[in-house]
Amino acid sequence: MENIQKLIARYPLVEDLVALKETTWFNPGATSLAQGLPYVGLTEQDVNAAHDRLARFAPYLAKAFPQTAAAGGMIESDVVAIPAMQKRLEKEYGQTIDGEMLLKKDSHLAISGSIKARGGIYEVLTHAEKLALEAGLLTTDDDYSVLLSPEFKQFFSQYSIAVGSTGNLGLSIGIMSACIGFKVTVHMSADARAWKKAKLRSHGVTVVEYEDDYGVAVEQGRKAAQSDPNCFFIDDENSRTLFLGYAVAGQRLKAQFAQQGRVVDASHPLFVYLPCGVGGGPGGVAFGLKLAFGDNVHCFFAEPTHSPCMLLGVYTGLHDAISVQDIGIDNLTAADGLAVGRASGFVGRAMERLLDGLYTLDDQTMYDMLGWLAQEEGIRLEPSALAGMAGPQRICAAAAYQQRHGFSQTQLGNATHLVWATGGGMVPEDEMEQYLAKGR
């Protein structure tokens, strides 16, 4: 306890985190892209290479997953305006939201219905390509739909993949790995929803369940993989490959905005609100957004009050050396995808200069907004996916933050607020009804 008091003396905001208060922290260490980029350790070239790899796999994906065929084997989500929800939020919170609110529907991404379809699928494909190239079975000029042949399935069946997950990452990696022909084991934490485990098993995936939280599931997955030279462990806490799979979203969003005639520049700032668990998904997306929009995009991470691992790590500068459990927080939240007690040290250190801030919100707030969005826009998401929805009113209410960045009323009026909806497209009807019943 005395250690917590010492921490609070140095970092006063920790007191609010411990008290489970909804908290907003604006990052005093935020820099320009030019200053912050060298610390990421990855470059625009790396993201372009990921983009090219996904293009090579597009013919394969279009055939393996017919729901991606219309988009030519690209796994991408829509961006939609949510004016009725914007009005509802203004009414509920008594706070005007300047500019326009949009929703990025990663919740409805093909194959696995969450943001994890980006990173998870990309890393499985990267590994498959590497094995096939090394074995001389494939060249990068081939039509990758050959990977659907029995010979390739046979080849990949010698190898296995393991991952630890609270649910959505396991879903994307499990479904993709099984499709390619890998043997796959997903180590699921206690928070994982029963339907996600059942769906994985229906694809022939081995699911190992733990009574403990995310950190334990990842650790056990890592251990199990170490003893088998043919097993590849996808490390959600440290993977650069996952991170790059998410980062591709930046250029793609830029193209979507261009198609819609939406301007992002100094006088039309873009604010993006990303739900954060261990940090790989939002970190990778934020990195891609920064490369695409430079200093005109402002990224915020959103976490449950019971799992504020990234806010705690970045704010104190302790990163993965501290967990929410260390300050007496239980890491129990309805936002199962965000139930992580210790943030990725790689993501925290890579992105701490490129984030404008982080905030926390209560489970009940997520349930309330889940209900409002369903009522106002007819869009149904899982609780985690609503974490970003609280962002716009926090930013619009923050005069000191606006002054520090020199935002004028005109700029704020021209702003775009993009809420990144991370999952929910595959939630079973009965489960969704239970979520909706919890909103006020």
From Swiss-Prot:
Which reaction equation describes what this protein catalyses? D-serine = pyruvate + NH4(+)
N6-(pyridoxal phosphate)lysine modification, residue list? 116
What is its quaternary makeup? Monomer.
Q: List S-S links within the chain.
A: none
Domain of life where this protein originates: Bacteria
Which GO molecular function entries does the Swiss-Prot or TrEMBL record give? D-serine ammonia-lyase activity; hydro-lyase activity; pyridoxal phosphate binding
The EC number on file is: 4.3.1.18
Q: Which family does it belong to?
A: Belongs to the serine/threonine dehydratase family. DsdA subfamily.
Q: Name the top EC class.
A: lyase
Instruction: Give the required cofactors.
Output: pyridoxal 5'-phosphate
HAMAP family (alphabetical): D_Ser_dehydrat
Provenance organism: Salmonella paratyphi B (strain ATCC BAA-1250 / SPB7)
Task: Cite the entry's keywords alphabetically.
Answer: Lyase, Pyridoxal phosphate
Gene Ontology biological-process annotations: D-serine catabolic process; isoleucine biosynthetic process
- This one is known as D-serine dehydratase
